[in-house]
Amino acid sequence: MLHSKEPISSLEDMVGQEMRGPTRVVTDLLGELGATPVGMPLPLIPENLSKGVISGTVLPWEVTPSIRLAELVSNHTELSGDTSLYTAVFIMAMNWDSYEGLPDDLRQILDDHTGKGLAASTAQVMLDADAGGRNVASGNTFITLDGAEIERWKAAAQPVVDRWVTRAGEMGFDGEAAI
């Protein structure tokens, strides 16, 4: 989700935008899309929007009320369908030896409440959390990029994907398989 002072309805609209990115990869992505990427922590977004240091940010809806983003920007751009600008990965991990050291009944509880079931329910919680941020911004402008425009953004973003795959390979991982 892009939140910006000026409307962003095409790839060309990204040019000249000073956009805050949450991670190194997303910051690289913003640069490939034509924006001037700016890295900064979340708490600095309101001040930097107010001062004109940035003109927008990439941020999930559920976070926006906590920094009063809807009061600082009036445009919100999202991609149509189930496409998103990027994906954040959350991992719940446990040391294997610790897991193996648990009694069978406790391992069974963990097995029953993790994996695909936990992933699906967590994804739904994240989707449901968007409603609060959307409601707060209800008087603002919402822009949804259509399929043809999304394809243009994907083509522009491909160098970021290629670099990620290369870096993964350099670390001994199959980046293509991960994607």
Label each PLM-derived region with a short phrase.
Residues M1-I179:
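N-terminal secretory/targeting leader peptides
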